[in-house]
Regions:
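Conserved acidic donor-binding segment of nucleotide-sugar-dependent glycosyltransferases
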Residues: 344-345, 349-356, 365-371
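A charged, aromatic-enriched C-terminal amphipathic alpha-helix characteristic of glycosyltransferases
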Residues: 70, 358, 371-403
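Short hydrophobic beta-strand element within catalytic cores of glycosyltransferases
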Residues: 329-332
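Carbohydrate-associated surface elements
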Residues: 169, 188
Length: 411
């Protein structure tokens, strides 16, 4: 069957699914933004979208929808040309709803089945908004702003035939009337690559090598920011380093903002928070390595003695489950997305998000007594194998789901 993937940064969440469906003989095509330079084994067509400046005062709560629907219009116009000029009609469209690209595709191809990747539905209460009072002052206006950001996300599913979310908690953020059409299948992790390796090493900039057995504490995120607990982790470090004089801390992540706002007058949170604790740190043992190639990330998870992962009630990072697959002892925040995967004392450890002293104590314990937590590391690996194995569990389920939406074979 013909399958059209739609994602402004393709392959995105379809990195493994699209090639797998192509390998199974399906005619796969992707529609993506003209600025997207990522490689793809699936043929790609590009639409041109020039974002217009939006008058916030005039649009008020409609600003987000204006921006997203504008992209939806650009995408739909490209889709219409694809239909008119090449007579292209997909059987299934699988698109991410986050940027509005799927909003009008049913107007171009009403006969196609539309599957929407439903990653997260913003809420004024009970999720990320208002969670961290240090950076978010609760107000009714804030609640309405958050609700206003959901307009394109809800509309995307209203016009869709089905939805897909990676976790139960993320699916639960959607209203009940929409939640019923969403199936939960995680993207999965490659457990054959992310596996324990006692021979692994990680090179530091000064030429030193970190090895399995070394006292290595790790923290990984796309960008270093409050949404992922960077401020809490950094505030916990002085006590950890004082208690563990041999510990080395490796921090992976960029100095931009993926979620929320940047500090006033600055591009990111890295130095803003670091400067708060710098005088209390042995900075020679804290290694900011920026964004690293995937092979280096894998090696780092393999040498990690303790891996800290914190998140607001928000989208769960793949990296947490990848760390578990590599056999790391993950110390995670006691927030709903993490609790869906980690049970305290079973396959990892949990700490209240805001309890800096508890983070210091638990991470110090994890560094000091690795043998005590070896059973947790083994069960973390089992969790990845039994629930999140991409090749054996997640990808087959996703393939089956997509294929179930296509034309049924004649009996």
């Amino acid at each position: 069957m013909k399958i059209l993937f739609v994602h402004q940064n393709f392959p995105g969440q379809f990195l493994h699914l699209a090639p797998e469906l192509k390998a199974r003989g399906h005619d796969c095509l992707a529609l993506t933004d003209a600025t997207n330079k990522r490689a793809s084994v699936v043929p790609v067509l590009k639409y041109k979208h020039e974002a217009q400046t939006v008058d916030a005062a005039a649009c008020r709560l409609g600003r987000n929808y204006t921006q997203m629907s504008d992209r939806g219009v650009s995408c739909a116009r490209a889709a219409l040309q694809l239909r008119l000029q090449q007579n292209y009609v997909p059987d299934v469209i699988f698109g991410h709803s986050g940027w509005g690209e799927t909003l009008f595709l049913k107007e171009v191809w009403p006969e196609a089945k539309l599957l929407v990747y439903a990653e997260f539905y913003y809420k004024g209460r009970g999720a990320d908004v208002g969670f961290d009072l240090e950076f978010s002052k609760p107000s009714f206006d804030q609640v309405m702003v958050a609700q206003g950001r959901t307009t394109h996300l809800g509309q995307a599913l209203v016009h869709a035939d089905a939805g897909l979310s990676p976790t139960e908690w993320q699916a639960s953020t959607y209203p009940a009337s929409i939640r019923a059409m969403i199936k939960v299948i995680h993207d999965g992790v490659d457990t054959a690559v992310l596996l324990p390796n006692h021979a692994a090493t990680f090179d530091l900039a000064d030429g030193r090598k970190l090895r399995t057995g070394d006292e290595v504490l790790t923290f990984v995120n796309r960008n270093l920011e409050p949404y992922r607990g960077y401020h809490i982790f950094m505030r916990a470090l002085p006590a950890i380093l004082a208690a563990r004089p041999q510990a080395q801390v490796v921090i992976v992540g960029g100095d931009e903002v993926s979620y929320g706002a940047a500090p006033k007058g600055e591009k990111g949170w890295k130095d803003h928070i670091l400067n708060e604790v710098r005088d209390k740190l042995d900075v020679a043992r804290v290694h900011f390595v920026g964004k690293v190639p995937y092979a280096q990330f894998v090696a780092l998870m393999q040498v990690s003695r303790a891996h800290a992962y914190l998140t607001y009630p928000f989208v769960l990072s793949w990296s947490m489950i990848e760390a578990m697959s590599a056999g790391a002892h993950v110390v995670g925040s006691r927030t709903a997305p993490v609790q869906e995967v980690i049970t305290d004392g079973e396959n990892g450890s949990l700490v209240d998000f805001f309890d800096v002293a508890a983070w210091s104590a638990k991470l110090t314990e994890a560094l000091a007594e690795p043998e005590k937590f070896q059973p947790l590391r083994a069960r973390a690996r089992e969790t990845a194998l039994n629930r999140y194995d991409m090749r054996k569990i997640c990808l087959p389920k996703m393939v089956e789901y997509v294929e179930s939406l296509g034309p049924k074979a004649a009996v």
